[in-house]
């Protein structure tokens, strides 16, 4: 089982269809790191329990798509190039 999963936001994208947010979820932690062009390496969003974290994911599950680490790096590179 993978310890870290990455999900891109499919609703909020820029004009080139790149996501404006990526969610980094680590299996054993009660936080989700939210990556965006202002926080390329991520900023933590804490939960009171793994259950509340999983509930958050269930709420947004229709608007996210799982990506692999290579796609994450590609998106981060795009954000770095296009920061204004």
Segments (PLM) and residue ranges:
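Short intrinsically disordered terminal tails
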Residues: 1-2, 80-84
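Negatively charged, low-complexity tracts enriched in Asp/Glu with abundant Ser/Thr
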Residues: 1-12
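Acidic, low-complexity, intrinsically disordered interaction modules
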Residues: 13-62
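Residue-level detector of alpha-helical secondary structure
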Residues: 53, 57, 61, 65, ...
């Amino acid at each position: 089982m993978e310890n870290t999963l990455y999900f891109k936001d499919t609703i909020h994208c820029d004009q080139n269809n790149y996501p404006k947010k990526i969610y980094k979820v680590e299996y054993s932690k009660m936080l989700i790191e939210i990556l965006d062009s202002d926080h390329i390496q991520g900023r933590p969003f804490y939960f009171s329990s793994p259950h509340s974290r999983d509930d958050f994911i269930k709420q947004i599950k229709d608007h996210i798509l799982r990506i692999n680490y290579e796609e994450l790096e590609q998106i981060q590179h795009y954000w770095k190039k296009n920061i204004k």
